[in-house]
Regions:
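A short beta-strand motif characteristic of beta-propeller blades
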Residues: 16-19, 51-58, 62-64, 103-115, ...
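Beta-rich, blade/repeat-based domains predominating
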Residues: 18-31, 61-79, 116-126, 161-173, ...
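Short, conserved, GDST-rich strand-edge loop motifs in beta-rich repeat architectures
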Residues: 23-32, 78-91, 278-294, 344-354
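Hydrophobic beta-strand positions that form the internal "hydrophobic ladder"
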Residues: 36, 75, 133, 174-175, ...
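Short loop/turn segments that connect beta-strands within beta-propeller blades
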Residues: 49-51, 99-101, 148-152, 188-191, ...
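Beta-propeller blade signature
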Residues: 91-98, 292-305, 356-358, 362
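Asp-box/WD-like beta-propeller blade repeats and closely related beta-sheet repeat scaffolds
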Residues: 104-145, 149-167
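Loop/turn-rich, solvent-exposed surfaces of beta-rich toroidal or solenoidal domains
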Residues: 261-306, 310-348
């Protein structure tokens, strides 16, 4: 075989055209308005939802749960590694990726106890000024690892007994939800050292109507939704965390018709328009929201606390029917003309139930744009921090 190859005329070899195996490029310093990350187990992939174009990916140790620097330069990714792959000595780090090249530029050692969870919200967050990153730990004791992003080092680990998850609250505070319905606020100084921990009772009733951890941040409010569709607003604008008055996503008529929140990412924001988007479904049982996917998105004016429109999750090019199983996650992109994304993982019952896809709509008027077929797996993240 080798001799036969050597006998080929040189002109034949020279004329052969070889395909490249991919394009290596550098992304713009400023994230595109419609860029969205699909973050799943072991990988996070970046796409442009407007063009349905694939932009790149990063490999991750464990579940990918990114946090983005406010200036858009870096992606912070907590990772977990074992010396024998699935066993052995455990090492936890925060890897710092350059957001333009998607290459790792540094890693920061953290306590080997970070919570590995599927929820896209509550495992890691970054302060509004980008100075400190907090990683939620679960062993089952709970604590927060605080990382100084400028020094690229661990500033400290602080216990949050009886509480879980982490949500940034300005430049030097983080809040966590507690098992009895209280909220714990951790305040730190400019070196990342603990200044105080304040526990405030009565944010919610975990027995009567618990909230999901999948909150969204709108300016100085964290908006949580309960299983019954009540919005619990956590005000972080002042020096002390405060509880705003609760309001309902559903009217009495909606409740009588058995409408409920749905999916694994059931809230999204159009920050420029001050609108909250909720993924909902109509079903007789009021189960855990994650156990059912959504068929509609309802849009609310946050200031007026009222619904303004409904968007059916249907692809008119595919016959206008909502696929069996519905949609699991929603996200709103940035910019003056934001897009609404509705993602489904596939595998549902009935015709077409096995095909993953993302429906893309114009968020402001609900008009359909296109469908992204066979998208990367994972939760949805927008690489901007325009809080």
């Amino acid at each position: 075989l080798l001799s036969g190859l050597l006998m080929l005329p040189s002109s034949a070899i020279a004329a052969e055209e070889f395909d490249s195996f991919g394009l290596v490029t550098v992304l713009p310093a400023e994230p595109g308005d419609h860029w969205v990350w699909f973050a799943g187990g072991g990988r996070a992939s970046l796409m442009d939802a407007g063009s349905a174009g694939y932009l790149g990916n990063v490999a991750v140790g464990g579940q990918a749960l990114p946090a983005f620097s406010p200036d858009g330069r870096f992606i912070y990714m907590p990772e977990t590694f074992w010396t024998r792959g699935t066993r052995g000595t455990r090492t936890d780090i925060v890897t710092v990726f350059d957001a333009s090249t998607l290459l790792p530029v540094d890693e920061i050692a953290i306590p080997a106890k970070r919570a590995q969870m599927l929820s896209p919200i509550g495992a890691v967050d970054i302060t509004d000024d980008g100075k400190f990153l907090a990683v939620y730990n679960l062993t089952p004791a709970t604590s927060l690892s605080i990382i100084d992003t400028a020094a690229r080092s661990l500033a400290g680990e602080y216990d949050i007994p009886g509480c879980s998850l982490v949500y940034a609250a300005g430049d030097r505070r983080f809040v966590s939800l507690c098992s009895n319905g209280a909220v714990l606020t951790l305040s730190i100084d400019d070196e990342g050292r603990e200044l105080s921990k304040v526990r405030q009772e009565g944010f919610l009733d975990p027995e009567l109507d618990p909230v999901t951890e999948r909150a969204v941040r709108y300016r100085d409010e964290w908006l949580f939704v309960s299983y019954a569709g009540m919005i619990h607003s956590l005000d972080i604008g002042a020096n002390e965390t405060a509880f705003n008055e609760r309001w309902s996503l559903f009217t009495p008529e909606d409740r009588a018709d058995n409408w409920h929140i749905a999916g694994s990412q059931h809230l999204a924001l159009d920050r420029g328009n001050g609108e909250l988007f909720a993924l909902v479904h109509q079903i007789s049982s009021q189960d855990e929201p994650l156990s059912h996917d959504g068929t509609e998105v309802w849009v609310y004016d946050i200031a007026e606390q009222r619904r303004t429109r409904r968007i059916l999750l249907q692809d008119p090019e595919a016959g206008g029917d909502t696929p069996a199983g519905g949609y699991k996650a929603i996200m709103i992109t940035s910019g003056e003309q934001p897009l609404l994304l509705a993602s489904r993982a596939g595998g549902g019952p009935g015709p077409g139930g096995g095909a993953p896809e993302v429906l893309v709509f114009h968020a402001r008027d609900g008009s359909f744009l296109h469908t992204i077929k066979s998208p990367p797996a994972g939760a949805l993240f927008v690489p901007r921090s325009d809080r």
